Amino acid sequence: MSAQEIIVENYMQALLKAALLPMPQEIAEFLEEEPGSLGVYIEMLRLADNVPVALDYVWYHIRFSYLLSENLESELYEIIRKRDGTQMNIAAGYLDIGLATAQEAELLKVKKGEPLLIERVNIVDNNGKPVHYGKMLIVGRRYRLYY
């Protein structure tokens, strides 16, 4: 028996938070900054046909602070490419499993403790300079990853 395929007609993202915030140590190290220095923090809820499928937490290097004056519900990589020509590449990444906290469950419209696929990815530019550190919490039963 196979799972029923769902065709998504409307994919969008909703901005939850965008700010300059002090970076935790792990993130600052990847972005080649001192812990506590400012980074561009962006939190998004990703939706498919108005159903939450993922939460995206991303820390951009401070050189991308101009993002805070852009429409963050559009494609951020496209904004960066058009603005300064930066091309992005995956430096490292991995998949893991975690359980939804109460806050995550509320945003994703799942039960607290539901298993979530966690995708962590570090992105660099063509010169190897760090662009962003990302963590996405994915509702596996509502999402398909393509490789």
PLM feature spans:
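Short linear motifs at protein or domain termini
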Residues: 1-8
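C-terminal all-alpha effector/ligand-binding and dimerization domain
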Residues: 9-147
